[in-house]
Amino acid sequence: MINSSNVNFKASLVSKTTVLKRAENSFKTIPQEASFIKLSLNNSYDNKALKDIKQSWQHPFAESMYFDFVDYLKHIEEGNIFALTTQNKGFKNIDPEKVLGLVEVLPNGKTGQGIFLDYILKAPKNIQAKMGDFCKIGETMLNNLKNFYKGEKILLFSLSDDSIQEFYRRNGFKQQEIGSNLFIFRPTSK
């Protein structure tokens, strides 16, 4: 697991990344710079941004992430919420309108057992790639998580939807057994 001795009281940049943006009046995409950030559990601005997202997205996962953020995660070492955003600086004040997606992770048992991906959620306006301004948001968030937790296995329980489960397979996750909703990403050893 990642061990950081620095205490941070604002969202911090994990990595610069790229998302694909749909060109005007076209289904062609163009790359746009984005940021993958980790929210600070001790920051009132991050709390407010997540609360605003919960209210504007009106999704039960966003609501669960918000309540986990303000209460539950403070008691769990290595529990984090990450955001993919088109905001590229000024992470003290996250602009909820620029957040493309959120991911909540928890430790999976003891240190060294990997992480558990509790929630992954795209902004509602980008759920359908054909209709949204941005696409490949989920893939971008997963790739950034894999880099952040380099060498760790990532576990998740998928919804029982064939297209969602296929999304995880395309991104390197293996279904544990046929009919199971448990998927695991195991990093390749070098």
Regions found by a protein language model. Name each.
Residues 5-132, 136-140, 144-190:
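Non-catalytic substrate-recognition and accessory regions of acyl/acetyltransferase enzymes
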